[in-house]
Amino acid sequence: MEPKTKKQRSLYIPYAGPVLLEFPLLNKGSAFSMEERRNFNLLGLLPEVVETIEEQAERAWIQYQGFKTEIDKHIYLRNIQDTNETLFYRLVNNHLDEMMPVIYTPTVGAACERFSEIYRRSRGVFISYQNRHNMDDILQNVPNHNIKVIVVTDGERILGLGDQGIGGMGIPIGKLSLYTACGGISPAYTLPVVLDVGTNNQQLLNDPLYMGWRNPRITDDEYYEFVDEFIQAVKQRWPDVLLQFEDFAQKNAMPLLNRYRNEICSFNDDIQGTAAVTVGTLIAASRAAGGQLSEKKIVFLGAGSAGCGIAEMIIAQTQREGLSEEAARQKVFMVDRFGLLTDKMPNLLPFQTKLVQKRENLSDWDTDSDVLSLLDVVRNVKPDILIGVSGQTGLFTEEIIREMHKHCPRPIVMPLSNPTSRVEATPQDIIAWTEGNALVATGSPFNPVVWKDKIYPIAQCNNAFIFPGIGLGVIASGASRITDEMLMSASETLAQYSPLVLNGEGLVLPELKDIQKVSRAIAFAVGKMAQQQGVAVKTSAEALQQAIDDNFWHAEYRDYRRTSI
């Protein structure tokens, strides 16, 4: 259902003059009416002409096009965001296809690497380990009191770029921009946070411009106690907040998720969001091919927390489709840098142990090696689906893709590693190596592939199709937790909007122009499932839909009325 338009009520504010112009959430720039200019002491502080937001957005678009590099475009958009947030979101929504890769992946990776160099203005909260005893005071300093969504990182595993220290702040800022642009969550409700626990990146430690704590990363008990202090302070300040963990290192990501997911409404987008969008993509791709996901054999390259999270969600989905757990697990094969995960492999991480194959079941495989490589696995398993979450470029070689295609006429290949410099294989190569037969979805955006005079659109398996809708659904329903079933409902809803399924052609995922519609549908499904699972108060479907409509923020200026503080 489309949101119902309603007249915005006037907003009563106490700020005036230059202070108002410096307030990004309230600043209208040249769009302040003459009456507002008189009432708020703005006469003479702005050019004479009163503009509409669309006129402002058109000027900003012209200026944007004058920048030649993606990082310069990113800096320009961040400057608008830090001076006039309403205009920023109107501009982004007008040009989402063009600007999403600039405000988030892949350009945000470069922005994180150069964070201290391109720093202009503070946004969000920086919590240094040295300030750990001032945690409550720090959160009290946040100017927006009604925070509903926090994205937090410690900067240790930023995309595929590794430890970026406080430069990782670019990720929470970018993620929350998408919560608003795609999911309609008011920017006044969002807070980006970086936990500055030091950095092991020697280049940053040696950089005179680096703005973070110049110290090796704290670890073990010190680290977990610090994170716990943060969580407890957040719970006290905003007990109903949705907390998203973002780009934590593999060794910490799953332990933190498992520790806090039943203590505070929280999830890890790298693990659960990536899994949800991948499963939604696979459900749609399987249906488009005339089958079910439970019929497919799946090979993963990359057995970290993200890869294993996707695998577990695939197993849950195939069980929903009728497989036993044992049968579901036998169809999923995990390969890391040491080869196929088997029950004979030493030093497995806890979350890997349920995803091993029994070595005794592989005795008839065509291989002489004790270490079973990706090529060995593809040759013997004959998979229908190949998923890359390795963070290493070029590992889907021509030999591997051709071997897969030899046994699978319509292979599904998903090189999901970010940014584009880390992708396991390019869509151009995959299409060519499979004679145009592969269905390709990537983690980073790629242009359509032209092969033998035919155009192949490349779907971006973008978490932005999932997490904004989850956030909106949690806020609208008042959910106290995010359950696995809520994530599964998001995947199923996403698959229902696949153009390839609906029309028999086009992308396997919706176009970005439809992302708000998809987010609202996911929000409804997530909210409904939250009610069914008892983590949200039950209401009628109409009441839930109305709550979604009421919470969906639009990038439009409101009339201001003056009041005293």
Swiss-Prot record:
Binding site for a divalent metal cation: 246-247, 270
Gene3D superfamilies xref list: Malic enzyme, N-terminal domain (3.40.50.10380), NAD(P)-binding Rossmann-like Domain (3.40.50.720)
Residues the record marks as active site: 104 (proton donor), 175 (proton acceptor)
Keywords: Metal-binding, NAD, Oxidoreductase
The EC number(s) this enzyme carries: 1.1.1.38
Cofactor: Mg(2+); Mn(2+)
Catalytic activity from the UniProt record: (S)-malate + NAD(+) = pyruvate + CO2 + NADH; oxaloacetate + H(+) = pyruvate + CO2
Annotated site location: Important for activity: 270
Keyword ATP-binding: no
Family matches, as Pfam families: malic, Malic_M
A cellular component annotation (GO) from this entry: cytosol
GO process annotations (BP): malate metabolic process
Residues bound to NAD(+): 157, 270, 418
InterPro entries assigned: Aminoacid_DH-like_N_sf (IPR046346), Malic_enzyme_CS (IPR015884), Malic_N_dom (IPR012301), Malic_N_dom_sf (IPR037062), Malic_NAD-bd (IPR012302), Malic_OxRdtase (IPR001891), NAD(P)-bd_dom_sf (IPR036291), NAD_malic_enz_proteobac (IPR023667)
SS bonds (residue pairs): none
Record's protein name: NAD-dependent malic enzyme
Species for this entry: Escherichia coli O1:K1 / APEC
Upper lineage: Bacteria, Pseudomonadati, Pseudomonadota, Gammaproteobacteria, Enterobacterales
